[in-house]
Amino acid sequence: MASAASSLPLLVSSLLLALFALGAHADVKRYQFDIVMSNVSRLCHEKAMVTVNGSYPGPTIYAREGDRVIVNVTNHVKHNMTIHWHGLKQRRNGWADGPAYVTQCPIGSGGSYVYDFNVTRQRGTLWWHAHIAWMRATVHGAIVILPAAGVPYPFPKPDDEAEIVLGEWWHADVETVERQGSMLGMAPNMSDAHTINGKPGPLVPFCSEKHTYALQVQSGKTYLLRIINAAVNDELFFSIAGHNMTVVEIDATYTKPFAASTVQLSPGQTMNVLVSADQSPGRYFMVAKPFNDVPIPADNKTATAILQYAGVPTSVVPALPQTMPATNSTGSVAAFHDKLRSLNSPRYPADVPLAVDRHLLYTIGLNIDPCETCLNRSRLAASLNNITFVMPRTALLQAHYYGQKGVFAADFPDRPPARFNYTGVPLTAGLGTSLGTRLSKIAYNATVELVLQDTNLLSVESHPFHLHGYNFFVVGRGVGNFDPAKDPAKYNLVDPPERNTVGVPAGGWTAIRFRADNPGVWFLHCHLEVHTSWGLKMAFLVEDGSGPDESVLPPPKDLPKC
């Protein structure tokens, strides 16, 4: 079923890690990303799609903590392009962050741009992806940041490791799918399959037998799997038949280890797990299936890959996991996330802000706005504090840096315009929003608490939110309406999970805290691309401080122009 070539990514990873061990003194890593059209075939369908260097998923970036990374991106396709280095903090250097019209204008057809950044006090698994329209469906890849030379993992050293990139596949051109949905004012068509390392696996009908990723393992050895949810619109469960996983890291921050038979990741999140090849030699399915906790149409397609013990014939039928959570199992997801704790060791402390300077409450809404050219003369929209974000025509960071007027207003409200029973009966009237390019101005070094509150406008739904430029601590979460008088007493201020992307439960809330010590303009958005395209986003404008290293760096000379 799986060819020997399917194990090449693990071999390449092992060789690169060995080279890093030999050349630990190297501190500059250079990469060339060519944005090209490639013909790719899955499920009996071939299509031309945008890729980096002709590969899907794209190449892995390898670096060490403390390295400088230089990536020259050359755009050979007709589409505009940007690349976001998801989870890298880019201190003072928003010019390298990548979201189109937020920190940079796009790289036009035939153009190039050099992303030049330092990996400072970060180590673990992150990822990169296109950050314009829905291009990230095919333009994405892993980032592996090894600990600084001589610094061990804070868990047993694995014998080997591999990246596991979870994604989605559309037969149609993804940009066409998004554009058709936008023109109609409706939700775009769902994907045709989920993938593991770009392949749907043999359980999906239609020519999928040869499109199966296989990870070869040796009995008795332990492997570090670097799992990335690169799906466009789906939260996913991941499980390996017959094998437990030990969670040791989320979003490139170490955790207190714990065992799990199934893990759950929202789009944008990463997770490192240890897996021991301690079962009877055989072939075992790795499974990725959607988590969906609301009664609306959703993907329910399962992707599979194979954990292949060395020496076992490929004719052996792989075993499936005996039990996995139901697609709508909110209880198992909540129980899993309750186990996530920062390592909080002397080397890796959890520096949770205990005092708060700014308290923010953002309500998450799914809305309906008028649209004379759309089906039913209306379009689906989304909002924070009832504001649907409008993307500007020039980059926000450039407008801020150069003092350009009329691009944005720095008046995003700290609270919703009206209080109501956010998670009560579904609200079907008064669903319109206000439109605006509105930012929230934050003083340098201020401590911020942001409560993200889901609402029942149209329907409750879980939302993964990603904050650029920062990690944050997830100090609390709950079901129902956030109670500012009672809920903070239940916060975990000792060892809460530290993340860059967090899920807000359907009909519930999530509270995060961070210190605004990174000046610039930083995007906050839902990482379900369908919701982001509807306007579920905003940005923080973190002011410069007074110190010599507390202001935005000057822009690079090759920064693209709008």
UniProtKB/Swiss-Prot annotation:
Annotated signal sequence range: 1-26
UniProt-annotated glycosylation sites, renumbered to this chain: 39, 53, 72, 80, 118, 189, 244, 300, 328, 376, 386, 421, 445
GO biological process: lignin catabolic process
Record domain Plastocyanin-like: where: 34-150, 160-312, 411-546
Assigned GO CC terms: apoplast
CDD domains in the record: CuRO_1_LCC_plant, CuRO_2_LCC_plant, CuRO_3_LCC_plant
EC number(s) stated in the UniProt entry for this protein: 1.10.3.2
Residues the entry annotates as binding Cu cation 1: 84, 466
Catalysed reactions listed for this entry: 4 hydroquinone + O2 = 4 benzosemiquinone + 2 H2O
Names of the cofactor(s): Cu cation
Hydrolase in keyword set: no
Main location: secreted
Family that this chain belongs to: Belongs to the multicopper oxidase family.
Function, in words: Lignin degradation and detoxification of lignin-derived products.
Protein name: Laccase-2
Annotated source species: Oryza sativa subsp. japonica (Rice)
Gene name of this polypeptide: LAC2
